[in-house]
């Protein structure tokens, strides 16, 4: 009989890698297998230092701009990150005669296409998103300067003065859920009744699913841990959702060693989730840290099962990626399901 205090860890599902992030990491690993190191990657492939450092150890070299690639390595492939890039970047790659692989999330690519479609129909494009985010920079860069207006807040929406209020269409940053954009959209649609919406399939399923799972698990949680990087938009938002949905405390952490166990108040239930760019191996690490201090029971708090998969670039489909290749991020896949003891189901329902 363990002398450790009891603790329930409520493990959210879905959590962590979405299909777009998984695909982007696979593209880098497959390129390393097929073409050997170095493989250059423009910008962080996903917003997670653990993932970036793991890929660096395997031969990936990260740059912010293409002109940072040494001339003697310009015969090596370069990968564009999952966030997408402006058209000017692929044009620059062609000028340098670079062989590039585009790891842009297919859902982000759909947003790009929708923005272009709006323009072809004579509409000015409104982009709801966060200034400076790589995805926003990439989407705005699909069209010429002045063709896209960024709206970040309800106040922006209230004060926006378009050239022609009857010829507007909107798209959104994929890491914002329908709920995140609802207030801004309400204002825009009231002011501009003919505002054209994007096609339904351009909405990111993963952002909404992770927020719904956090909402469902938050009530009754003494502590809600979200695994993610400070520069991960969707991870920071999960912390806000946990706080608003009833968790006593919510914290963003990148690794288990960031948890200050000494300062934590008495714990009975800890809920655990991860942003779309956070690897499962960190979930394993955090659970192990709690097991060293508590007699842990795992509850699976699953709201939906995700089955989406995106194909990698055509050039890489002849290369085989093994589970061992992905072990540095995937850890013990489906951690709690592999446990033969101390595992229960927590019935969840997103409000």
Swiss-Prot record:
Annotated GO biological process: dimethylallyl diphosphate biosynthetic process; isopentenyl diphosphate biosynthetic process, methylerythritol 4-phosphate pathway; terpenoid biosynthetic process
Cofactors named for this entry: [4Fe-4S] cluster
GO molecular function: 4 iron, 4 sulfur cluster binding; 4-hydroxy-3-methylbut-2-enyl diphosphate reductase activity; metal ion binding
InterPro entries assigned: LytB/IspH
EC numbers on record: 1.17.7.4
Residues involved in (2E)-4-hydroxy-3-methylbut-2-enyl diphosphate binding: 47, 83, 133, 174, 232-234, 277
Chain residues that bind dimethylallyl diphosphate: 47, 83, 133, 232-234, 277
Active site: 135
Residues reported in the UniProt entry to bind isopentenyl diphosphate: 47, 83, 133, 232-234, 277
Catalysed reaction equations from the record: isopentenyl diphosphate + 2 oxidized [2Fe-2S]-[ferredoxin] + H2O = (2E)-4-hydroxy-3-methylbut-2-enyl diphosphate + 2 reduced [2Fe-2S]-[ferredoxin] + 2 H(+); dimethylallyl diphosphate + 2 oxidized [2Fe-2S]-[ferredoxin] + H2O = (2E)-4-hydroxy-3-methylbut-2-enyl diphosphate + 2 reduced [2Fe-2S]-[ferredoxin] + 2 H(+)
Enzyme class: oxidoreductase
Role summary: Catalyzes the conversion of 1-hydroxy-2-methyl-2-(E)-butenyl 4-diphosphate (HMBPP) into a mixture of isopentenyl diphosphate (IPP) and dimethylallyl diphosphate (DMAPP). Acts in the terminal step of the DOXP/MEP pathway for isoprenoid precursor biosynthesis.
Matches recorded under NCBIfam families: ispH_lytB, PRK01045.1-4
Family: Belongs to the IspH family.
Designated name of the protein: 4-hydroxy-3-methylbut-2-enyl diphosphate reductase
Species of origin: Bartonella tribocorum (strain CIP 105476 / IBS 506)
Gene encoding the protein: ispH
């Amino acid at each position: 009989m363990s002398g450790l205090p009891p603790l329930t860890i409520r493990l959210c599902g879905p959590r962590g890698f979405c299909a777009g992030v998984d695909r982007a990491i696979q593209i880098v690993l497959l390129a390393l297998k097929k073409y050997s190191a170095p493989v250059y990657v423009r910008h962080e492939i996903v917003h997670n230092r653990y993932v970036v450092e793991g890929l660096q150890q395997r031969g990936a070299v990260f740059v912010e701009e293409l002109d940072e690639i040494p001339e003697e390595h310009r015969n090596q492939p370069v990968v564009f990150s999952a966030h997408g890039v402006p058209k000017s970047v692929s044009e620059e790659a062609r000028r340098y005669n670079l062989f590039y692989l585009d790891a842009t999330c297919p859902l982000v690519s759909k947003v790009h296409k929708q923005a272009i479609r709006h323009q072809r129909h004579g509409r000015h494009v409104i982009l709801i998103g966060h200034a400076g985010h790589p995805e926003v920079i990439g989407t705005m860069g699909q069209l010429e300067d002045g063709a896209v207006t960024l709206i970040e807040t309800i106040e922006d929406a209230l004060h926006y003065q378009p050239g022609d209020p009857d010829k507007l269409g909107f798209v959104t940053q994929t890491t914002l859920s329908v709920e995140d954009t609802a207030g801004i959209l309400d204002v825009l649609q009231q002011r501009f009744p003919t505002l054209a919406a994007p096609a339904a399939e351009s909405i990111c399923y993963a952002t909404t699913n992770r927020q719904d799972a956090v909402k469902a698990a938050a009530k009754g949680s003494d502590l809600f841990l979200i695994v993610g990087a400070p520069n991960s938009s969707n991870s920071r938002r999960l912390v806000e959702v946990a706080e608003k949905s009833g968790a006593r405390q919510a914290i963003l952490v990148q690794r288990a060693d960031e948890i200050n166990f000494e300062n934590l108040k008495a714990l009975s239930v800890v809920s655990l989730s991860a942003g779309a760019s956070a690897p499962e191996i960190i979930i394993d690490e955090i659970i192990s840290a709690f097991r060293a201090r508590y007699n842990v029971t795992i509850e699976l708090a699953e709201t939906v099962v995700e089955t989406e998969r995106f194909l990698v670039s055509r050039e890489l489909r002849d290369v085989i990626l093994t589970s061992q290749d992905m072990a540095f991020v995937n850890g013990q896949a489906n951690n709690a399901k592999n446990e033969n003891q101390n595992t229960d189901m927590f019935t969840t329902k997103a409000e």
